[in-house]
Amino acid sequence: MIPVIALVGRPNVGKSTLFNRITKTQDALVADFPGLTRDRQYGHAQHENKSFIIVDTGGIGVDDIEVDTLMSRQSQVALNEANVILFLVDGRSGLTGIDQQIAQALRKLNKKVHLVVNKTDGMNEDIACADFQSLGITDVHAISASHGGGISSLLEEILEPFTTETHEATDDKAIKIAFAGRPNVGKSTLINRILGEERVVVYDMPGTTRDSISIPFTREDKQYVLIDTAGVRRKSRIDEKIEKFSVIKTLQAIKEAHVCLLLLDANEGITDQDMNLLGFIIESGKALVIAVNKWDGLEEDHKEKIKSELSRRLHFANFAKIRFISALHGSGVGGLFKDINEAYHSAIQSFSTPKLTRLLQDISAKHTPPCINGRRIKLRYAHLGGHNPPVIVIHGNQLDALPESYKRYLNNEFIKHLGLVGTPLKIEFKGGQNPFANKKNKLSQRQVNKKKRLMRWAKSKK
């Protein structure tokens, strides 16, 4: 299971800054496209090939809320799900009474807690940390969230117990499908419809009701595992913070899956919660199929309105197939597995270096890269850098100056010519390095003698 790291601390100690710093340490699969919203209370991050989910529990001890609310429902869910807790304090302000109360509450959780002393830039780290020795937390780290100091070593230590997991499946293994979406969007109805059609005898439901439910079954001699996730609910005013953490199980299921099936409600259209979930799926690089449920019985003008909204708001996910279905009546459900298999096989495909290089040459010849300071950017060769999602590594010169518009052009052309369906594509650029950079030019003996003659001649002319 993907580890969960929770950030805890009083307000203004730098939790949001650290959260943003950590979630941006990975090479983002997608840019912040207009219209793609994210709930920044949780996020996906990666450090040295180890993926994890990070959660910001918000400030404690503000707005006249007692520190005991740490143990209340609004933070209890997140802290119970967390594998590691990072307790942030302010190295400049020193130890406060609220810090002491939070530490006392954390001790009751029986969780691994790391004390993170923030804002230590320009300070003696030992002196800054010494003020917090009375809290009795042995694992202490001095960092600067705003400047990035100490964060890499912090992540390295807290992730050390967790193994590097790869989720590249082969054809002889079951394809894991995560059914994601808001409550009442029809996830369970759709799964029951699929199971009913396939007449599955085995129905395994491990864990508690709060856990994701994994259901193995066979369809046309292929093995699948359906993962019924907890719904991402709309945030009410009272339970706003509670609802932010109800998504953790869903996010873990998405990270474990090979393909994500995002279910939307045709009656409600695309909500902010849908966009949050879609953003996380794309960030995670997962193969994706979108199903618009409750399509039966809608007026034609409403159907056209929904299609227009999908085209307008989901342009950044145009690689994904969209199906219009009715989980209750079964219409359109049969075509979902065709899309799921296409997306899965696109995500794990392999391409040879000669094929990718020839394709790169054809694409760049069709629309040549721009010139920078009178020199044209050169794209030399390409090779495969990974699977699920597919990663193509392009080598060349002056690639740092390659415009974003041309990068999008390359991405779209590779997707089209490789026939990728239902999976995002990541392209990495690596510029050529001068092998003689920072090396002193060693002269031959003949060149040394000539240099001496020139120097003697120059002196004789003075």
Curated annotation (Swiss-Prot):
PROSITE patterns: G_ENGA (PS51712). The keyword ATP-binding does not apply. Residues 349-433 form the KH-like domain. GTP 1 binds at residues 9-16, 56-60, 118-121. InterPro entries: G_ENGA, GTP-bd, GTPase_Der, KH_dom-like, KH_dom-like_a/b, P-loop_NTPase, Small_GTP-bd. GTP 2 binds at residues 181-188, 228-232, 293-296. GO terms for biological process: ribosome biogenesis. It comes from the Bacteria. Residues 3-166, 175-348 form the EngA-type G domain. Keywords: GTP-binding, Nucleotide-binding, Repeat, Ribosome biogenesis. One of its GO terms (molecular function) is GTP binding. Associates with the 50S ribosomal subunit. Belongs to the TRAFAC class TrmE-Era-EngA-EngB-Septin-like GTPase superfamily. EngA (Der) GTPase family. GTPase that plays an essential role in the late steps of ribosome biogenesis. This is GTPase Der. The gene is der.
